[in-house]
A protein has these predicted regions:
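Helix-start/capping segments and mature chain N-termini
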Residues: 1-27, 45, 51-232
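Ordered, amphipathic secondary-structure segments that act as subunit-interaction surfaces
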Residues: 18, 34-42
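Phosphate/pyrophosphate-binding loops at sites that engage ATP/ADP/AMP, CoA/4′-phosphopantetheine
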Residues: 28-33
Length: 232
């Protein structure tokens, strides 16, 4: 449903139901081998604009689904994080309530800045200066056996995989808190991991000068995810 909600947020008329998308995807993946990892990208775009070609013309919508063979990342691959001078936007100045391509240039400059500092990704602040997410994924921290993740505040998307991790961890008996998280909280965490649809779980081994291990709860989060995925 997220792609249709995103289209509506961008004033684009969604034209394909979730059920129809699933049918198209199931037909498309028949062309791949069962051992291939297929990344699925449904997308809409406006074909015509109204006056000044800015506001999308309603009902005239392009749609496609991209199926791409992208191998799963090495489970031992870990990220390093640093801060960035760029922040997550707010609804008043961008479509933060949509999964939208127009948001990615901001993410790209976050990543580029982090890499010039010798890190693989950026830990990004919201408008208030608290932790929102990384440049590419949602963020979780672990402290004293409990799990914490930034509470959605309209500056980032609470991802599908993020929500699955929360459900899995709670069902497994862990306490999971959605709350305001500071950069100091991240520095003082026992474990840190990233959550995204492409990589599922990515351990974080450093935030600036602070180092972390790929700890037991990070590993358990990965196990729970794949147990859930294979159960279907």
């Amino acid at each position: 449903d997220r792609v249709n909600h995103s289209a509506e947020a961008m004033m684009i008329t969604p034209t394909v139901s979730s059920e129809e998308m699933v049918d198209i995807i199931m037909d498309g993946i028949k062309k791949y081998n069962s051992n291939q990892a297929i990344y699925i990208r449904p997308m809409y775009w406006a074909i015509e604009g109204g006056d000044l070609a800015i506001v999308p013309k309603q009902g005239v919508t392009g749609f496609a689904i991209c199926l791409e063979d992208i191998p799963m990342a090495d489970p031992n691959l870990a990220a390093t994080l640093t801060t960035t001078s760029f922040r997550r936007p707010v609804l008043e100045d961008n479509v933060v309530n949509a999964k939208a391509g127009c948001l990615y240039p901001n993410n790209a400059r976050m990543l580029a800045e982090a890499r010039t500092k010798g890190f693989s990704n950026a830990l990004v602040a919201d408008i208030m200066g608290n932790v929102a997410e990384t440049a590419t994924a949602n963020i979780f921290i672990v402290k004293d056996g409990e799990v914490f993740t930034p509470i959605p505040n309209g500056t980032f998307l609470a991802g599908i995989t993020r929500n699955r991790h929360i459900s899995n961890l709670k069902a497994d008996g862990y306490k999971v808190h959605e709350k305001v998280i500071s950069f100091k909280d991240v520095s003082e965490a026992d474990e840190v991991f990233m959550s995204g649809n492409m990589m599922k779980v990515t351990p974080v081994k450093a935030f600036n000068d602070t180092n972390y291990q790929n700890g037991p709860i990070t590993k358990r989060t990965r196990e729970l995810y794949w147990d859930w995925a294979k159960s279907g």
